[in-house]
């Protein structure tokens, strides 16, 4: 059985032709699905013999909503979603004046090992398929009965470690026949897999690339990001310049501020010199504290000083507004908390004895 959400329009048209059907049926079927009709029997202009073929060959794979947590602070909603194989992922809905934005996952867990991130603590379980990535938007959109207009690939997982499925997702999610979310409203965050940055640049998409930098030197970056042992900052910045030249799109550098690790004035000055002259923007992120490590967030004064120093170097800077702090809204925190709770309850009930 095939998940229809994994199919582009051209792929479904090709399947129709190969199976003795008119290609235009593919357009009709996807039109129904992206309008919210998931049952083949309810697709009124599809002949019954084709409906039967669809039932025998396809399904519309949507995850189950396990839990929804809503912030009392800002209305952010965190969704814990479950797939049929028992794996869990997280998606976060953020409401802004300009529309609804969703942060989605691209993998179950993560292999990158960044020291301050909860989603990587137990490693990568598996990649999400194209349809599983897409389905997060669909199931949340159905739940809130409102359109989602902005997408951030910044949840659990490294998008460029799931490159082919993510690229196909970007094609489908922005297509008129599907969710029709413009590429300029999509941000892809990566810790810096250099060869894939070049490949992505050659696609010449209109998405925003966000690069998780978090340090100005290779030695300091290696302390908190194992990926730095594979690719140096110099290699990453060279790839970023290539991306800028190919796409004419500004890059966002993400910088998680960790107290007494990378938040000093000298760090800010060095980062300013490093990025000076690039078509870029720096997003400062007060680190989310998790119990599995001792990293603490920087003080408000340190964050303000860091920002001011970058601005003095001609760098555009914003400090990320913290959302959903009362519901473990940082990537990986909710999934891990839920799994731990289930394990404790299982032990108490004797299921693991």
Swiss-Prot record:
Name of the protein this chain belongs to: Probable dual-specificity RNA methyltransferase RlmN
Cofactor note: Binds 1 [4Fe-4S] cluster. The cluster is coordinated with 3 cysteines and an exchangeable S-adenosyl-L-methionine.
Family in the record: Belongs to the radical SAM superfamily. RlmN family.
Cofactor needs: [4Fe-4S] cluster
Gene for this chain: rlmN
Known catalytic reactions: adenosine(2503) in 23S rRNA + 2 reduced [2Fe-2S]-[ferredoxin] + 2 S-adenosyl-L-methionine = 2-methyladenosine(2503) in 23S rRNA + 5'-deoxyadenosine + L-methionine + 2 oxidized [2Fe-2S]-[ferredoxin] + S-adenosyl-L-homocysteine; adenosine(37) in tRNA + 2 reduced [2Fe-2S]-[ferredoxin] + 2 S-adenosyl-L-methionine = 2-methyladenosine(37) in tRNA + 5'-deoxyadenosine + L-methionine + 2 oxidized [2Fe-2S]-[ferredoxin] + S-adenosyl-L-homocysteine
EC top class, as a word: transferase
GO cellular component entries: cytoplasm
Binding residues annotated for S-adenosyl-L-methionine, in chain numbering: 157-158, 189, 212-214, 288
